[in-house]
Amino acid sequence: MIKKKTPYRILIFDDSEGIRSLLYGFFNKRGYEVFSFPNPAVCPISHEKTCPCPTGLACSDFILSDLNMPVQQGIDFLEKQKRKGCKCKNMALMSGDFTESDIVRAKSIGLVLFRKPFSITEILDWIERIEKTIDPDRKLADWFFEK
């Protein structure tokens, strides 16, 4: 029996329907499990006080967020997730108007930055580099499917 590998999973946050649709289609065609949200407030992981994922499991392989969104800024959301113990190691922030302060803050918490308008090949380079390091037999948390 052939063992099916776990598909890569990405969470996408952007208030622009066009950007979400573009990224959803791109990752979906690559075989990813894709969850996209117009802002962090509508994602179940943002409402938990601590990381709800079981020990050793991450909610996703990648989190890609816009900087400027209604309700909560992407950098605030990602920083909060890191403080709560989020186990997703690969997080990136996109914006067309990063300030020097945004750049310094994002880099200080280990975020990859993509300046809009970005080329999809920039994101492809980032994910392909990381895909090579991800164990295909890893398990991902699925607690938020039950919410």
Locations of regions flagged by a protein language model:
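Two-component/phosphorelay signaling modules centered on CheY-like receiver
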Residues: E17-V42
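Acidic, metal-coordinating helix/loop segments flanking the phosphotransfer/catalytic sites
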Residues: S36-F62
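Acidic catalytic/metal-coordinating carboxylates
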Residues: N39, Q73-D76
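Active-site residues of response regulator receiver
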Residues: D66
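The feature encodes the CheY-like receiver
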Residues: P70
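Short amphipathic alpha-helix used as the core "switch/output" element in two-component signaling
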Residues: I75-C86
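Hydrophobic/aromatic residues positioned on beta-strands within the core alpha/beta folds
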Residues: L93-S95
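C-terminal output helix
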Residues: F118-E128
